[in-house]
Amino acid sequence: MTKLWGGRFTKTAEAWVDEFGASIGFDQQLVEEDIEGSLAHVTMLEKSGILANEEVEQIKKGLHILLEKAKKGELNYSVANEDIHLNIEKLLIDEIGPVGGKLHTGRSRNDQVATDMHLYLRKQTKEILQLVKNVQAALVEQAKQHVETLIPGYTHLQRAQPISFAHHLLAYFWMLERDYGRYEDSLKRLNVSPLGAGALAGTTFPIDREYTAELLGFDGIYENSLDAVSDRDFIVEFLSASSLLMTHLSRLCEELILWSSQEFQFVEMDDAFATGSSIMPQKKNPDMAELIRGKTGRVYGSLFSLLTVLKGLPLAYNKDMQEDKEGMFDAVKTVKGSLAIFAGMIQTMKVKEETMTKAVHQDFSNATELADYLATKGMPFREAHEVVGKLVLLCIQKGIYLLDLPLSDYKAASDLFDEDIYDVLQPKTVVARRTSAGGTGFTEVKKAIAKAEKILAN
């Protein structure tokens, strides 16, 4: 098959070479964006007096026919035509005749593909923003039900201090809020039009770049044609934001996996988000949480891959940049799928309050409260820390917990202890007293929920 760019060549490549160089197998996902960009471009060509009205109407009609076929999955692509851009141009010429070849006037595939990807990522980013909000809403709904449900807080995966389960869930709300902000902020740099930059140096045709930018809903245009066609920062930024988002999802998935184990029994995943074993009838595996944890690495890989591609490229376009798309497409699919699954898991998980409550009563996570108690009575905190450490050791030797220790043992350790110590050591009291801003105290958690709901409502 003769290439649309084949004028200066004396022979064509063999099929296996075409196969290696072609991107149509994956960039066909840009078909709607490609046609959308072409419709804006040809509209501008008429406005600028470059093409006649009758030519433009023919081209528009053909493009709309192709768009409808694309939506129905009825377009037949050819590897010989390499990519989505040449495939659409060839299909357009087949549909309306030689006038279809005028569509590419004043445009290069270099600015065309960049435009397609800007349009694609803008749409996907906006959809991801909504999915992030869905997960945040699920976290808040669970938090509202568990303000006074206590759970051990951990450091080094060792029980540290009792906290409100709602407080733990809300930690992820705020992580996701930062993720939301990163995606939202990236739109400022993403929503800029490269269309009209040509191959690298602009064009001699009297095009109107601002007009096509307006038609496509962009906020402005790239100020430098070289930058316009060689920039992939917007994809890197998307992948970076996505990597952080997936990190946050993965961390909570790790906790859900632990919490749903027999060793913890803090939560139970809904059957819809778990699987069984082909050999062990008793098993209920948290597969969806494990998959999100595992898929996080795919997104990291896409980010590192693109950074590696870009780091040594001279300006402007290089064929290496064809490698920007598969990772982008994969990351979009992974992030959207993970967010949808995650929201469902959080909405439907069963919280085992009794097990959580038992856990905070059978540990030493209230020990810090003892040290604070002594410090408020004038003992230097470092000395109080030493006293309480010895009391914990005494309890371990006796096989009891701090609430079980007789007052006589407390008095022997320090005269500052009194009978009110047993009130102070109650896990619910320990949590309620953490009233510093952003703390786990019930009043603070309720404030945090109210603030989170206000954010979701805006």
UniProtKB/Swiss-Prot annotation:
Keywords tagged on the record: Amino-acid biosynthesis, Arginine biosynthesis, Cytoplasm, Lyase
EC nos: 4.3.2.1
Cited InterPro entries: Arg_succ_lyase_C, Argininosuccinate_lyase, Fumarase/histidase_N, Fumarate_lyase_CS, Fumarate_lyase_fam, Fumarate_lyase_N, L-Aspartase-like
Reaction(s) this enzyme catalyzes, per UniProt: 2-(N(omega)-L-arginino)succinate = fumarate + L-arginine
Pfam family of the protein (one): ASL_C2
A single cellular component GO annotation: cytosol
CDD domains tied to this protein: Argininosuccinate_lyase (cd01359)
Compartments, record wording: Cytoplasm
Source taxon at top rank: Bacteria
UniProt-listed GO biological process terms: arginine biosynthetic process via ornithine; L-arginine biosynthetic process
SUPFAM superfamilies per the UniProt record, alphabetical: L-aspartase-like
The keyword Cell division belongs to this UniProt entry's keyword annotation: no
Pathway: Amino-acid biosynthesis; L-arginine biosynthesis; L-arginine from L-ornithine and carbamoyl phosphate: step 3/3
Coiled coil: none
HAMAP family in alphabetical order: Arg_succ_lyase
Name this protein carries in UniProt: Argininosuccinate lyase
